[in-house]
């Protein structure tokens, strides 16, 4: 029994570490791409779309036989992809250059729209409100090796793409026009980074629900140590994100033992405090 519990905890820890790594790398990449310190992997609205897919699966009992949470994961990833197509399509129609302001605006509007649809779905499944609420708060309890492999595969593929764009992300720091002048294909890099981030976020949301502030706070903390160079920032953010989420998950399990908190509640509570502290220190440094 002890071996079984230990094995389950080991699987959970791996899921937590991989999720924290993925969310933090996505946050660092989006902050560099959009030159916006408030950006993270959810800025595009894809995480909202993934949440909608998962909630629909839970509310209406969409499952795949033999694999736990497979229906929820499949629907979340499908809706993440559809959300990206919708957001980029609207942004391209409004602004063919896919400017940062347009992308952020479309992402915010889309997230608000999805939020209203989520509320509508919940009204049609009142008996599933508790399950939906717990899932949307974020939790990695009860995950298996299938989820570890899904997270690992997504991180290797899409995380590798983001690491490969480190030089181009450094160029974005001096502005899109200047990046274009030194030979960076701005539109291609934007699309590449946004697709990779969206895919990785979609997988994370499909496995663990909505876990906020990891991709927002961790890159800020790491940047204080490594500086803005993405060749150092991205790997350091990956390491920092894993540690941050593992600490938050430990608190979620033990703070009110035997009752377990959703890890997303802990990350939001700690992350919001850390973000305020970092923001104040940064503002003081600028003065």
What are these regions (language model features)?
Residues 7-287:
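Alpha-helical transmembrane segments in inner-membrane proteins
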């Amino acid at each position: 029994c002890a071996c079984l519990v230990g094995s389950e905890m080991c699987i959970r820890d791996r899921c937590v570490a991989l999720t924290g790594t993925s969310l933090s790398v996505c946050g660092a990449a989006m902050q560099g791409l959009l030159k916006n310190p408030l950006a993270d992997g959810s800025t595009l609205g894809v995480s909202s779309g993934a949440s909608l897919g998962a909630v629909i699966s839970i509310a209406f009992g969409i499952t795949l036989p033999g694999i736990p949470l497979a229906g929820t994961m499949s629907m979340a990833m499908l809706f993440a992809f559809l959300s990206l197509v919708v957001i980029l399509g609207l942004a391209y129609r409004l602004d063919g250059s896919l400017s940062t302001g347009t992308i952020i605006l479309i992402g915010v509007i889309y997230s608000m729209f999805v939020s209203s649809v989520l509320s509508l779905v919940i009204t049609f499944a009142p008996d599933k409100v508790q399950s939906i609420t717990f899932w949307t708060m974020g939790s990695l309890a009860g995950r298996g090796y299938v989820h570890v492999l899904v997270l690992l595969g997504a991180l290797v593929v899409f995380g590798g793409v983001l690491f490969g764009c480190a030089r181009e992300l450094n160029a974005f720091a001096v502005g899109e026009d200047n990046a274009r002048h030194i030979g960076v294909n701005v539109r291609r890099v934007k699309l590449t980074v946004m697709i990779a981030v969206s895919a990785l976020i979609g997988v994370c949301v499909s496995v663990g629900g909505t876990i906020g502030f990891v991709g927002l706070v961790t890159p800020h903390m790491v940047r204080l140590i490594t500086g803005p160079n993405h060749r150092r920032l991205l790997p350091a953010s990956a390491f920092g994100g894993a540690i941050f989420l593992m600490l938050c998950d430990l608190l979620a399990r033990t703070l009110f033992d035997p009752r377990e908190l959703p890890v997303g509640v802990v990350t939001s509570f700690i992350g919001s405090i850390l973000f305020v502290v970092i923001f104040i220190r940064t503002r003081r440094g600028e003065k």
